[in-house]
Amino acid sequence: MATFVELSTKAKMPIVGLGTWKSPLGKVKEAVKVAIDAGYRHIDCAYVYQNEHEVGEAIQEKIQEKAVKREDLFIVSKLWPTFFERPLVRKAFEKTLKDLKLSYLDVYLIHWPQGFKSGDDLFPKDDKGNAIGGKATFLDAWEAMEELVDEGLVKALGVSNFSHFQIEKLLNKPGLKYKPVTNQVECHPYLTQEKLIQYCHSKGITVTAYSPLGSPDRPWAKPEDPSLLEDPKIKEIAAKHKKTAAQVLIRFHIQRNVIVIPKSVTPARIVENIQVFDFKLSDEEMATILSFNRNWRACNVLQSSHLEDYPFNAEY
């Protein structure tokens, strides 16, 4: 049922996955179980979401029920930027692996390129509320992550929220052992990322779209922010296909060969979000949706925009 995108490692990454950012404890376990039953095989996780232990319980239960085998699942997690120092990479990774109750990850990503001050505080800020940078860079972290691949603990590495300049920096790193297989970025019709997708694809790097529905439940949403799910043109296209706005927004990525990870903890929506393989948007509809771009970001983490590796000062 699920279709895949082939990575540069020849591994197959399911093109639709379940996002777990902002999925609350007490709900995320059930969400993952519902997703696996609905045919999802790709689950997107992260250390900073602080819910990996519940995701892990759900995966374990489904494996024990023989509903799915580990090798059929594609599990992604991310290294948070307070852990860029080599020994800390290992520590953070081991906690993720233990919480997820797995013996390996399919892909391990660098969550953001800008390093934060090391320590227990995941969001180290100064008295003005600005993020405090760290000494280690994403290049330091990458070397430690490559060791995890050598040890069979991770199948492949990737990045998230990287601009093409940062990917370039990584690809040009002397002694680079493993290239990133994906760049996970915010992407939806108001932020179509055409140049970045073109660049990544030209380098053999897939793109994974987070917040494909425009992250309507983000805690910092303002009433005047645009709403994709309520966009009349999206709703019009959806009605034509007898689909929902969310299904159109997800299908839009699939047709660009972009992996997409909608988040939901509502069982009916989790099921709905993967029922996207039985219709096709026309070239005209795709062009219309692409024309909505306004470079609007739901997630711009402005409190770290002064740091050297902040990604969004670049055009793409």
UniProtKB/Swiss-Prot annotation:
Annotated phenotype, changing residue 125 to L: Increased affinity and reduced catalytic activity towards all-trans-retinaldehyde
Molecular function GO labels: alcohol dehydrogenase (NADP+) activity; aldo-keto reductase (NADPH) activity; aldose reductase (NADPH) activity; all-trans-retinol dehydrogenase (NADP+) activity; allyl-alcohol dehydrogenase activity; geranylgeranyl reductase activity; indanol dehydrogenase activity; retinal dehydrogenase activity
Gene3D superfamilies: NADP-dependent oxidoreductase domain (3.20.20.100)
Sites marked Lowers pKa of active site Tyr: 78
Active-site residues annotated for this sequence: 49
Keyword Lipid metabolism: yes
Tissue occurrence: Found in many tissues. Highly expressed in small intestine, colon and adrenal gland.
Name of the molecule in the record: Aldo-keto reductase family 1 member B10
This protein's encoding gene: AKR1B10
